[in-house]
């Protein structure tokens, strides 16, 4: 994407600052986890931080 800031993106980060977004394997909606939580149930075993969103 060119010239698009994070804030103008079509997908707003769904979690509070300091949390990360996990897409559960059995769900289509993100849940918010603390960065220290297990990501075993998340797609690709990852929890996406606001910086990485």
From Swiss-Prot:
GO terms for molecular function: ion channel regulator activity; toxin activity. GO terms for cellular component: extracellular region. It comes from the Eukaryota. Residues 1-6 form a propeptide. Disulfide bonds join 15-32, 20-42, 22-47. Expressed by the venom duct. The keyword Secreted applies. The keyword tRNA-binding does not apply. It is found in: Secreted. Keywords: Disulfide bond, Ion channel impairing toxin, Neurotoxin, Secreted, Toxin. The cysteine framework is IX (C-C-C-C-C-C). Probable neurotoxin with unknown target. Possibly targets ion channels. This is Conotoxin Cal9.2f. It comes from Californiconus californicus. The lineage of its organism: Eukaryota, Metazoa, Spiralia, Lophotrochozoa, Mollusca.
């Amino acid at each position: 994407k060119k010239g698009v800031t994070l804030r103008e993106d079509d997908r707003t980060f769904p979690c509070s600052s300091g949390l990360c977004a996990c897409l559960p394997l059995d769900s289509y909606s993100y849940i918010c986890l603390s960065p220290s939580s297990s990501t075993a149930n998340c797609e690709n075993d990852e929890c996406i931080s606001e910086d990485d969103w």
